[in-house]
Regions:
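N-terminal export and membrane-targeting signals
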Residues: 1-13, 50, 285
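C-terminal motif of bacterial Sec signal peptides marking the signal peptidase cleavage site
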Residues: 17-19
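Short, low-complexity N-terminal intrinsically disordered segments enriched in polar/charged residues
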Residues: 22-67
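Short beta-strand edge/turn micro-motifs at domain boundaries
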Residues: 23, 136-179
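Acidic/histidine-rich, surface-exposed loop or edge segments in extracytoplasmic proteins
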Residues: 38-44, 52-58, 181-199
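Short solvent-exposed beta->alpha transition segments
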Residues: 46, 55, 70-120, 405
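Juxtacatalytic substrate-recognition/specificity segment
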Residues: 184-307, 403-407
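Acidic/His/Gly-enriched intrinsically disordered linker/tail segments
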Residues: 256-263, 267, 283-284, 302-436
């Protein structure tokens, strides 16, 4: 199955380029429940009139966002001077900086009821609605992204208005970042906490990454646009990707985005961990951004999953392709394991990329060397054909065995070899490099 969140660019994978040491971890899909609402009882279903009134209000709010109409937007708020009201106006200011294409809200549904204390604060008619919104960025997205909001709704002078968004599990979005700023180039758009001078270096990295990816992943329908999100703290990064802060501590960046029913991504974001990223030298930072840009391009132009060793190895191959670094530097962690008698015996399995069960730096090294072996032996264009052939499982949610079968056919049809023969050659090369 294709994962919504992929391609964690690890600090460990770039340590030789960073002048630092440590182990990397990749974020895993969250298993925790959404934040609980302040409820002590189940909610009654909203009346039809109440729901219709809120739908109309949200339609006006969405139209105000699209037209950058501050007055109309403010008219949907119970107060423009409360903490919520001020946050909402700041959110509108942030949205005004974005090239918004679509922006809309779906049909609201009742969330769990407010507790007695909140009812006493807000009034007996107050209720909480869960709303799924969707948006896209013009020139960047070929599909929409969803975002979930929990709005607390109150009646004032016969009208329903928005009073808060903290009585449920409202998802943090890029436009919620403090000091929100946008910088844009031909191939990249960078969103984050400003000033612009802080974000421009990321824009330069993104622009170069797009060119690097195009040099390899040629002939595709990718639009060549990369959206980078640069928060100010690791905690903000974790919130944006729905993770616990500890799970992203050693992650330099991660690609996050939805798939359409066919299995194609069209609204990916590369979310940066600013602290981990700052620990890398410039060339290490470029590897990280190019790694993620590779994921973005491939996710936008293929619809079927491939083994993780191939997807992560491909991203690292493109990332390191133009970097002045030896394999001894890049794969130092793997070679150390081999010399200690703990080297791989097969191509990396999916669970070996899980930091909860293993040290994954050597796994990424092994995947990189496997993909590089294909490129060096058969050529980069054949590597791309091999990847596309491997990405031909029966469906976007294909089983692991179906993915492996498609990959085995790609070995035979494109490389004219078998998985077993390729693996023997790869293992032999790793052992020779570790010994040398």
């Amino acid at each position: 199955m294709r994962a919504k969140r992929v391609g964690a660019a690890l600090v460990a994978a770039c340590l030789a380029l960073a002048g630092c040491s440590g182990g990397g971890t990749a974020p895993q899909p969250s298993t925790s429940a959404r934040p609980a609402t302040t409820t002590q009882q189940d909610s009654a279903q909203p009346s039809v009139a109440r729901e219709e009134a809120l739908s109309a209000l949200l339609a006006r709010r969405a139209a105000a966002v699209r037209s950058r109409d501050r007055t109309a937007f403010a008219a949907t708020l119970a107060s423009t001077t409360s903490g919520f009201g001020l946050r909402q106006l700041a959110q509108l200011d942030a949205l005004d900086q974005l090239p918004i294409g679509r922006f809309e809200y779906g049909t609201p549904e009742a969330a769990p009821a407010l507790g007695p204390d909140r009812i006493a604060q807000l009034g007996p008619d107050a209720w909480v609605a869960r709303v799924e919104g969707r948006y896209s960025l013009t020139g960047c997205d070929t599909a929409t992204r969803g975002f979930e909001s929990y709005f607390t709704v109150v009646r004032r002078d016969g009208r329903w208005l928005l009073a808060d968004d903290t009585d449920g599990g409202t998802q943090t979005q890029a436009w919620d970042l403090p000091d929100f700023t946008v910088v844009e180039g031909d191939g990249a758009l960078v969103l984050g906490s400003g000033p612009a001078s802080r974000l421009r270096p990321y824009l330069t990295l993104g622009e170069h990454a797009v060119g690097q990816v195009r040099d390899v992943w040629s002939g595709s329908t990718w639009n060549g646009r990369l959206v980078l999100v640069v928060p100010r703290t690791p905690a903000q990064m974790a919130e944006l990707v729905g993770q616990q802060a500890d799970s992203v501590r050693q992650v330099a960046a991660v690609t996050d985005g939805p798939f359409d029913p066919s299995g194609r991504a069209g609204a990916d974001r590369v979310v940066v961990n600013p602290t981990a990223f700052a620990g890398l030298q410039r060339r290490g930072q470029q590897v990280v951004v190019t790694h993620e840009a590779t994921h973005v391009a491939i996710r936008a132009t293929t619809t079927r999953p491939v083994p993780l060793w191939l997807s992560e190895g491909m991203a690292d191959y493109v990332g390191y392709r133009d970097v002045d670094a030896t394999e001894q530097q890049v794969a130092a962690a793997l070679f150390a394991q081999v010399r200690a008698g703990r080297g791989p015996t097969a191509l990396p399995r999916a669970e070996e990329f899980d930091p909860a069960h293993t040290t994954i730096g050597p796994t990424y090294n092994a995947a990189w060397l496997a993909v590089r072996q294909v490129a060096e032996r058969y050529g980069t264009s054949t590597l791309v054909r091999f990847y596309r052939a491997a990405a031909s499982a029966p469906s976007a949610d294909a089983s692991a065995s179906e993915v492996d079968a498609a990959t085995a056919h790609a070995f035979q049809d494109v490389l004219h070899t078998t998985v077993a023969a390729f693996t023997r050659q790869w293992l032999s090369a790793i052992r020779a490099a570790a010994a040398g």
